[in-house]
Amino acid sequence: MAQLFLPLLAALVLAQAPAALADVLEGDSSEDRAFRVRIAGDAPLQGVLGGALTIPCHVHYLRPPPSRRAVLGSPRVKWTFLSRGREAEVLVARGVRVKVNEAYRFRVALPAYPASLTDVSLALSELRPNDSGIYRCEVQHGIDDSSDAVEVKVKGVVFLYREGSARYAFSFSGAQEACARIGAHIATPEQLYAAYLGGYEQCDAGWLSDQTVRYPIQTPREACYGDMDGFPGVRNYGVVDPDDLYDVYCYAEDLNGELFLGDPPEKLTLEEARAYCQERGAEIATTGQLYAAWDGGLDHCSPGWLADGSVRYPIVTPSQRCGGGLPGVKTLFLFPNQTGFPNKHSRFNVYCFRDSAQPSAIPEASNPASNPASDGLEAIVTVTETLEELQLPQEATESESRGAIYSIPIMEDGGGGSSTPEDPAEAPRTLLEFETQSMVPPTGFSEEEGKALEEEEKYEDEEEKEEEEEEEEVEDEALWAWPSELSSPGPEASLPTEPAAQEESLSQAPARAVLQPGASPLPDGESEASRPPRVHGPPTETLPTPRERNLASPSPSTLVEAREVGEATGGPELSGVPRGESEETGSSEGAPSLLPATRAPEGTRELEAPSEDNSGRTAPAGTSVQAQPVLPTDSASRGGVAVVPASGDCVPSPCHNGGTCLEEEEGVRCLCLPGYGGDLCDVGLRFCNPGWDAFQGACYKHFSTRRSWEEAETQCRMYGAHLASISTPEEQDFINNRYREYQWIGLNDRTIEGDFLWSDGVPLLYENWNPGQPDSYFLSGENCVVMVWHDQGQWSDVPCNYHLSYTCKMGLVSCGPPPELPLAQVFGRPRLRYEVDTVLRYRCREGLAQRNLPLIRCQENGRWEAPQISCVPRRPARALHPEEDPEGRQGRLLGRWKALLIPPSSPMPGP
């Protein structure tokens, strides 16, 4: 028994020996230590932006303190600042000698030292956002030393605010009311200056509390010189007439409650969002509350409604798919001039706010790499992580290369351009850098460029679900995603929104059509490889009977058929032409392969070239040649398929003006672009305006006047055009050989760094980069593309503020305003002209129910499809129970409405 007990006792003694030894050592250490340093107060210590804060640090001597003799006998005091794993000295003092870091000059002091050797508290004034971090107080006296540390959090955020309707819309009194309405206060000059010192930059003039108008600029440039020319600083217009109109700088600080993201399975309209929050004992959050929550650590990669009708989302930990390179509150604007909030019927998540007696904790920053859907959790937790300002390299001069960028008036959207702050005006922020205004990203806070989003307003008739086959919603609402005033450049393409392309099954009325090559756009998230090519049988023509077709809603601002240049092995190439642009046969080295064929609309002739022709070449197989429905009497004006004598193959192509050669048993067919006709597509049916050059279904006009990229795009849009987009090698050669100059083209990556898009929304189907291009690295400012004519027209990315010549391009065929209906209206803002294949959607007026297809398409003949929509009164619920309506008044009333409202050509809806 003793043999078992002794080992157990020894084990217990050994187990407790380390703890006892530690107590002894600690006691010895405490006895040997001459003093101890302690920072009083609960962590984190909180200060306010632009204010002052004293960090209390005291020395507690465990032995009698030394007598005050000479300076050499004084303790050495050192304050350091730790942030992001880096440590920087704030000041070092010994007696009356004090050394202060240049970054803290005139802002820090030891108010009690050396008069008191036990009080080494640090006074910090003019607090900035990047003053948040860990401060360590270290005291050394002789061979003894001790230290303590505390976290400091600077509260408060300054942000620019504007109404969604217009830019520069506030008088001084209106500016004060606007900030109060969104749960904030109008900022003071001291707060704006502190934000500027923290890296904030905004090239927009805004009201401050002292009735002055100012704006902060880190990197001076032409559009943002103000009263300081080429020097950085806060531009000041001085005291301004209170009736003048500007934006306003607001300040948000405390969040006295819980702010959480509402993420229901079904996205919400604005009214539904308000009801959603009320059902949970909360109210829809204000813009100021969201900024305060973001400043406290709220991070959600999901746009949500706010009380003022804006849609925003906060990013603390940015990533390439959520917020780009810098943190901030991102905002979705409707127009590229940063105005217009999303339509109230659009569907998003919602940010709710639940009031409480004490300031609430902020939801823990979510991981942006996670699924945004997981952000719907309403758990509120305390964030212990400190929000730090992102510092950019001071020596970086690429920021200046962004230069002055002016607002682009979007004539078709009714949006007007804006002038520079001196007028006053604005320069774009970074992306998301503002597409119409260039803004150099400041160290920490910067505006991101606008990113174009395509989203259709989704409307669904509840009664229609019960009585008719349910129609899926088509997304067709053009939203420009522009970040908010504190956003940062460079978000990834996958901005957190609903997929921009969703398939919808739509009924199509019979119509004659002429064949067009192409492939329908793929839904978002589906790769080409996942859809094998379809091989069609012998040439057949679809009978003109009603049938269902699949219509996808792609992300460009207008619905266009996505087509790509393809090359068959050893055979001819089919070159698709988006929006009526050029196409021509021939091979293109390195061009993408033809998209797999998809189901064609009614009126489509499905053709397949023979697998081998007489010359042994293999023709493309499984090519779906899609026809677009038109009125029978208009088929000639939109081009067509003509049969010419068989020549063995289509090389060289006998077709002119970009016509596509198709081989059939009965001969060779020429598929003509819109605006051309004849057997060989050699007859012009439409012509460009005087001064414009026609080429393969498009019109071009070159301007030798040198402008920045934004100014050039603005000028093109004034003509209803865009900077030239290039879809084929033939179009590249035409532009480069005809207009032999360095010139802008419409390609740019200002929306998302590295994701190049055409300004007219045409898919990027062809590239002609110079070797080593594009070479723009993050935040370098090389976001626009130039064609170098003497180098075979190869492309290079350069800063957008270069002044170069440019070429504008518009479709040869376009549609005017859509037909007006007495009981329905079109979604979106009207435009001067609509490209071919643009799809618009009608909606019935309030109180009426929709019947039949609500979509119309701009046809290749420049005419809109005849509207099929019918609007009828909603059926009262009790009409379903005849016994409750013995006199049949509901039925008679419904019959009179039908007779009055339904067009004679429209089919009568079933009961």
Curated annotation (Swiss-Prot):
<dbReference type="GO" id="GO:0005576">
    <property type="term" value="C:extracellular region"/>
</dbReference>
<dbReference type="InterPro" id="IPR013106">
    <property type="entry name" value="Ig_V-set"/>
</dbReference>
<dbReference type="Pfam" id="PF07686">
    <property type="entry name" value="V-set"/>
</dbReference>
<feature type="region of interest" description="O-glycosylated at two sites">
    <location>
        <begin position="520"/>
        <end position="530"/>
    </location>
</feature>
<feature type="disulfide bond">
    <location>
        <begin position="784"/>
        <end position="800"/>
    </location>
</feature>
<keyword id="KW-0373">Hyaluronic acid</keyword>
<feature type="disulfide bond">
    <location>
        <begin position="301"/>
        <end position="322"/>
    </location>
</feature>
<dbReference type="GO" id="GO:0072534">
    <property type="term" value="C:perineuronal net"/>
</dbReference>
<feature type="disulfide bond">
    <location>
        <begin position="650"/>
        <end position="661"/>
    </location>
</feature>
<dbReference type="Pfam" id="PF00193">
    <property type="entry name" value="Xlink"/>
</dbReference>
<keyword id="KW-0677">Repeat</keyword>
<dbReference type="InterPro" id="IPR035976">
    <property type="entry name" value="Sushi/SCR/CCP_sf"/>
</dbReference>
<feature type="glycosylation site" description="N-linked (GlcNAc...) asparagine">
    <location>
        <position position="130"/>
    </location>
</feature>
<keyword id="KW-0964">Secreted</keyword>
<dbReference type="GO" id="GO:0007417">
    <property type="term" value="P:central nervous system development"/>
</dbReference>
<dbReference type="GO" id="GO:0098978">
    <property type="term" value="C:glutamatergic synapse"/>
</dbReference>
<keyword id="KW-0768">Sushi</keyword>
<comment type="similarity">
    <text>Belongs to the aggrecan/versican proteoglycan family.</text>
</comment>
<feature type="domain" description="Link 2">
    <location>
        <begin position="257"/>
        <end position="354"/>
    </location>
</feature>
<feature type="domain" description="Sushi">
    <location>
        <begin position="813"/>
        <end position="873"/>
    </location>
</feature>
<dbReference type="InterPro" id="IPR050691">
    <property type="entry name" value="Hyaluronan_bind_Proteoglycan"/>
</dbReference>
<feature type="modified residue" description="Phosphoserine">
    <location>
        <position position="418"/>
    </location>
</feature>
<feature type="glycosylation site" description="O-linked (GalNAc...) serine">
    <location>
        <position position="905"/>
    </location>
</feature>
<dbReference type="GO" id="GO:0098552">
    <property type="term" value="C:side of membrane"/>
</dbReference>
<keyword id="KW-1015">Disulfide bond</keyword>
<keyword id="KW-0336">GPI-anchor</keyword>
<feature type="compositionally biased region" description="Acidic residues">
    <location>
        <begin position="454"/>
        <end position="478"/>
    </location>
</feature>
<dbReference type="GO" id="GO:0030246">
    <property type="term" value="F:carbohydrate binding"/>
</dbReference>
<dbReference type="InterPro" id="IPR013783">
    <property type="entry name" value="Ig-like_fold"/>
</dbReference>
<keyword id="KW-0245">EGF-like domain</keyword>
<feature type="glycosylation site" description="O-linked (Xyl...) (chondroitin sulfate) serine">
    <location>
        <position position="418"/>
    </location>
</feature>
<dbReference type="GO" id="GO:0005796">
    <property type="term" value="C:Golgi lumen"/>
</dbReference>
<dbReference type="GO" id="GO:0043202">
    <property type="term" value="C:lysosomal lumen"/>
</dbReference>
<feature type="disulfide bond">
    <location>
        <begin position="716"/>
        <end position="808"/>
    </location>
</feature>
<keyword id="KW-0393">Immunoglobulin domain</keyword>
<keyword id="KW-0654">Proteoglycan</keyword>
<dbReference type="InterPro" id="IPR007110">
    <property type="entry name" value="Ig-like_dom"/>
</dbReference>
<dbReference type="InterPro" id="IPR016187">
    <property type="entry name" value="CTDL_fold"/>
</dbReference>
<protein>
    <recommendedName>
        <fullName>Brevican core protein</fullName>
    </recommendedName>
</protein>
<feature type="signal peptide">
    <location>
        <begin position="1"/>
        <end position="22"/>
    </location>
</feature>
<dbReference type="GO" id="GO:0045202">
    <property type="term" value="C:synapse"/>
</dbReference>
<feature type="region of interest" description="O-glycosylated at one site">
    <location>
        <begin position="569"/>
        <end position="575"/>
    </location>
</feature>
